[in-house]
């Protein structure tokens, strides 16, 4: 199953905290340097280029939200995971947009993070 980017299931950044409380898993697909500079405290880091080899980490009983810097990479990952019959959503606008709605973005040292 292939989706165009406009068909990608997505959620808005202002919905994220409630969705995490409801049990959604947040997966950050950015590169290591991007993650180190700033990531959401509830996120799990699985870089985009390791998604296929990490499929055993995704369960069809769970719901996932994927995020990258702007939403493009995570959109492609979301479409792939959806094609595997796993409920998944892209975070619209990515980390750049999320930083306007969340105070839970930290660097790898636990200090206030930045999005690069």
What kind of region is each of these model predictions?
Residues 1-25, 32-63, 72-116:
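Rhodanese-like catalytic fold shared by cysteine-dependent sulfurtransferases
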């Amino acid at each position: 199953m292939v989706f165009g980017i406009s068909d990608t299931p997505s959620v808005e950044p202002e919905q994220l905290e409630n969705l995490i409380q409801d049990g959604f898993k947040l997966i950050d697909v950015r590169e290591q340097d991007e993650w180190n500079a700033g990531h959401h405290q509830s996120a799990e880091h699985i870089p985009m280029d390791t998604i296929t080899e990490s499929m055993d980490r995704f369960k069809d009983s769970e719901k996932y939200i994927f995020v990258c810097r702007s939403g493009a990479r995570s959109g492609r990952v979301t479409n792939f995971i959806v094609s595997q019959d796993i409920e998944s959503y892209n975070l619209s606008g990515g980390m750049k947009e999320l930083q306007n709605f969340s105070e839970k973005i930290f660097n790898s040292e636990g200090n206030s993070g930045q999005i690069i």
